[in-house]
Curated annotation (Swiss-Prot):
This is Zinc import ATP-binding protein ZnuC. It is an enzyme of class 7 (translocase). Part of the ABC transporter complex ZnuABC involved in zinc import. Responsible for energy coupling to the transport system. It is a peripheral membrane protein. It comes from Acinetobacter baylyi (strain ATCC 33305 / BD413 / ADP1).
Length: 259
């Protein structure tokens, strides 16, 4: 078995503690994310997943511990919910214009995410799936080192979910970004990620999906839910056989059918 070299580290958390109202939100968190890695964060409600993401994004600071990041680290975040005020009309093209990049990259990402026909639509009027694809496109236009996705499959139908799954797995190779995903979709977690981190205020277990599923703390939280693990990767996010469209030769997302 050939052992792949360890990719450069992008960010590391050391001995992180967060206290709020005399309660431990996070305790003794050691976590790192490497270039081109796909990591999924799972855990029950109240486990501290949102707090951990906020620390990584620099939105909040821990009460104790260190955050060590690569110089000029660029991060992009796709939130679980995005509800702009109806009093502030915002078209999709206006939202994308907030990110500066080449016209070629912009067109590529617009095509890949299936939002080319949504450019003049108001963000407030999009369906949940359309809005999710627009937010993903905007995040990719930022050309991040780390892309953070919070429940990206929510609001998608089965076909769109499968397409997004394949597309997300292609991103590290295509754009050179690491992916950190928060997800309750154990089917995706166990088949579409390289490393699973199970959080319940502390890191209960971490590693390959197959190993995590057998860990006692995972079993205690998820009640023995098991998903057949398929080894889709050679410690990178590519190499799968997927059915492609004739006009685009890489994973992408189809537009939603018109009503």
């Amino acid at each position: 078995m050939q052992i792949s070299p360890i990719a450069p580290e992008l960010i590391r958390l050391e001995n992180i503690y967060v206290h709020r109202d005399e309660r431990d939100i996070l305790k003794n968190i050691d976590f790192s994310l490497h270039q081109n890695e796909i990591v999924t964060l799972i855990g029950p409600n109240g486990a501290g997943k949102s707090t951990l993401i906020k620390i990584l994004l620099g939105i909040i600071f821990p009460n104790k511990g260190k955050v060590i990041a690569k110089k000029k680290l660029k991060m992009a975040y796709v939130p679980q919910k995005f509800n702009p005020s109806h009093s502030l009309p915002l078209r999709v093209c206006d939202l994308l214009d907030l990110e500066k990049c080449s016209a070629t990259l912009r067109e590529e990402i617009i095509q890949d995410t299936g939002i080319s026909k949504l450019q003049t639509a108001k963000v407030q009027q999009l369906s949940g799936g359309e809005r999710q694809r627009v937010l993903l496109a905007r995040a990719l236009l930022r050309q991040p080192d780390i892309l953070v996705l919070d429940e990206p499959m929510q609001g998608l139908d089965i076909q769109s979910e499968a397409e997004l799954y394949e597309y997300v797995r292609s991103l590290p190779e295509r754009y050179g970004c690491a992916i950190l995903m928060v997800s309750h979709d154990l089917q995706w977690v166990m088949q579409g990620t390289q490393r699973v981190v199970c959080l319940n205020k502390h890191i209960c277990c971490s590693g390959l999906p197959e190993s995590v599923q057998q860990h006692p703390e995972y079993l205690a939280i998820f009640g023995g839910q098991r998903v057949p693990y398929q080894h889709h990767h050679d410690h990178c996010a590519h190499g799968d056989h997927v059915e492609q469209c004739n006009h685009i030769d890489h994973p992408h997302i189809h537009p939603e059918p018109e009503a």
